[in-house]
Structures are given as structure tokens and as C-alpha cells.
A protein has these predicted regions:
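Hydrophobic small-molecule pocket/channel-lining residues, especially in calycin-type beta-barrels
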Residues: 2-3, 25-240
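Bacterial N-terminal signal peptides
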Residues: 11-21
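Bacterial N-terminal signal peptides that target proteins for export
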Residues: 2-13
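Short intrinsically disordered, low-complexity segments
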Residues: 7, 20-26
């Protein structure tokens, strides 16, 4: 299945990033430790805060979430656009049972995801983002804090949800991710959600990831899965 022109052009950019990362001097890059292929240690259907509690919602957030939970029980749920292969957005792509690849370049950092080959490029130039229209992947900008990659993303469309249970967000949500190596060669990502319209205060959750042996990021084409009678998103037990 061929990708859209946008996806094709973005792939070429990611190829360029990969070629730069493959340069003989790339192995000595101080931040190369976060590069490579990663897979989540778990695949939560519902996000909780770091202390294991439900995210603190406003009245509007509670209303939207209850509507999504009710819709999930219907014959044809509409709250989750990924069911018809539309982009699930971030941070949800990082909670799904698919590997993803991080490609590190001095000027940009690329993320390539296994589900329907979604990808994003993080601007490392230090310039602030200037969102034109809300997008599933938003407009990410990043910087290094020691070995940690810090990404701030805004311009995220409210058409996406934060997790499979239907946690909502608004177009004004700000997502901050702190990505850093931890013990045993793992990667930890700490997510901070700031969205006053939906959540009563900023809240954080975190995930850990490992290098899956012998696993590559391949294009799991969503429409092909549906044509075979399979769910749009693979079940976790089928991906471990």
C-alpha cells in the first residue's frame, strides 16, 4: 500500500537522518544512547498517574471521558479514530504494542513507529514551534539535558485520545516528554500532560522500554489488517 505524499516526503527525510546517523562518527555522538529500536515493557489500555491514580479531570474532561466510555460499549464505537486507521497521535503511539525507532541527528531527531508507519521529526534547532493547524503528531521541538532528550509538543488535534480507554484532551494540550537511559539498557519516558480545559492540574505518567532482540520496525498496514478481519491495532499478546 503506497503512502501519501506527506508520508513519502517525511520518509525521505527520515532516511536522510538515518544516513547521517550511520556516518562513522555517529557512534561517538554523546546522545546516541537513546537511538535504536525500542518496545514498551507493558501496553496499558488506561493511563494512570505516576502514583497510580486516575488523572485529575475537570468537569468537561469528566463529561468527555464518560461519553467515550459509553461509546466504547456501542456496536460501532466512534471515539477512537484508530479503529478506521486514522492517526492515533502522541503520546498514544508510544503505548501501543509495536516497536519504534529513534534516529538521532545533531539538528533533528526522528521517530519511526511500527503502526501504519507513522513518524515524526523533532526540531532540535532551538526555535519555538509555530503550529499552523492541529495535527495528530503536533509540532515537537526538543533539546538535550545531559543524556536526556526533552521534547515539548503542542498543536495536537483533539480528535485523538491519550489511551485506548478514551482519555480525552483539547487542542491546547501541551505534551512534555523526558526520554533518558536507565539501568539494564532500558529507556524511560516521563510524560507530562498540561491541559487546563480537560485536566484540573498537570499530571505525569511514565513508561520503560527495552531493545527487542531481532525485531525491526516494519510497516503494519492498518487497512490490510482490517481487510483480513483483524483489529486495527494488534493485541499485545500477538506482539511480544
Amino acid at each position: 500500500m503506497q503512502g501519501s505524499p506527506f508520508r513519502t516526503s517525511t520518509r525521505w527525510l527520515l532516511v536522510a537522518l538515518a544516513m547521517a546517523a550511520a556516518h562513522p562518527g555517529a557512534a561517538q555522538q554523546p546522545h546516541a544512547v537513546v537511538a535504536g529500536t525500542w518496545l514498551a515493557d507493558r501496553f496499558p489500555d488506561r493511563l494512570l498517574t505516576i502514583d497510580g491514580k486516575a488523572p485529575p479531570m475537570t468537569d468537561e474532561g469528566t463529561r468527555l471521558y464518560r461519553a467515550n466510555l459509553a461509546d466504547a460499549k456501542s456496536a460501532q464505537p466512534q471515539f477512537d479514530r484508530a479503529r478506521w486507521c486514522a492517526g492515533p497521535g502522541v503520546p498514544r503511539l508510544l503505548f501501543m504494542p509495536y516497536p519504534f525507532q529513534i534516529i538521532v541527528n545533531p539538528k533533528m531527531v526522528g521517530f519511526v513507529y511500527g503502526w501504519y508507519r507513522w513518524h515524526s521529526v523533532v526540531d532540535m534547532s532551538g526555535q519555538p514551534a509555530d503550529p499552523v493547524l492541529p495535527q495528530p503528531m503536533g509540532y515537537p521541538v526538543g533539546h538535550w539535558d545531559g543524556d536526556a532528550l526533552v521534547i515539548d509538543t503542542n498543536g495536537l488535534t483533539s480528535d485523538t485520545i491519550l489511551d485506548a480507554s478514551g482519555l480525552p484532551h483539547s487542542d491546547d494540550m501541551q505534551l512534555s516528554e523526558r526520554i533518558e537511559p536507565v539501568a539494564d539498557g532500558r529507556l524511560r519516558i516521563r510524560f507530562r500532560i498540561t491541559d487546563p480545559a480537560i485536566y484540573a492540574k498537570p499530571w505525569e505518567t511514565q513508561m520503560t522500554y527495552h531493545h527487542p532482540k531481532g525485531v525491526e520496525v516494519v510497516d503494519d498496514v492498518c487497512p490490510d489488517r482490517i481487510a483480513r478481519g483483524e483489529p486495527a491495532i494488534a493485541r499485545p499478546e500477538a506482539k511480544r
